[in-house]
Amino acid sequence: MSRIGNKVIVIPAGVTVEVNGATVTVKGPKGELVRSFNENITLEIAENEITVKRPNDTKEMKMLHGTTRALLANMVEGVSNGFSKALEMIGVGYRAQLQGTKLVLSVGKSHQDEVEAPENIKFVVATPTSIVVEGISKEAVGQTAAYIRSRRSPEPYKGKGIRYVGEYVRRKEGKTGK
């Protein structure tokens, strides 16, 4: 059984947390995040720590307790340090380039795929085959990286496509001729 909800969240220096009913605003050096949580879950802020409390021990409240704590911890981490997800492109002629805030992908199609950067998300293209998605919201960074990967996910025969750095792509053997 998970006890993540019982862990205390430490607020680092330079980060402020405001609770207004069920809405929580977290401000830090990298930006500001606002999110609404279930009104049954209560947040207690004392000095530089946040404690998440649940009203009872029903299954639903236990689930919400852990989820709320994890989301809140990610908000605090995001506004203080930020999040990033690195992707690599493998394949002949597979390229990425920035045009303003837009990411332009050449991934073996008859046209180029353009990915517009969502709010609070930044793309970094160090080399034509590497992409880094940066932002303060862990959810938005992961979702954007997954969308970029979906433009050409790695195929199992040659391993070509866009993959996360360090991702293992399971390979298949090709057909055997007579």
From Swiss-Prot:
Any one Gene Ontology MF annotation carried by this entry is: rRNA binding
Tell me which InterPro entries the record gives: Ribosomal_uL6-like, Ribosomal_uL6-like_a/b-dom_sf, Ribosomal_uL6_a/b-dom, Ribosomal_uL6_bac-type, Ribosomal_uL6_CS
Q: Which keywords belong to this entry? A: Ribonucleoprotein, Ribosomal protein, RNA-binding, rRNA-binding
Asked whether the keyword DNA repair is assigned, the reply is no
Q: Mind listing the GO biological process terms from this record?
A: cytoplasmic translation
SUPFAM superfamilies, alphabetically?
Ribosomal protein L6
Q: Name one GO cellular component term.
A: cytosolic large ribosomal subunit
- Self-association and partners: Part of the 50S ribosomal subunit.
Q: What does this protein do?
A: This protein binds to the 23S rRNA, and is important in its secondary structure. It is located near the subunit interface in the base of the L7/L12 stalk, and near the tRNA binding site of the peptidyltransferase center.
**Protein family membership:** Belongs to the universal ribosomal protein uL6 family.
Name it. Answer: Large ribosomal subunit protein uL6
Q: Which organism is it from?
A: Lactococcus lactis subsp. cremoris (strain SK11)
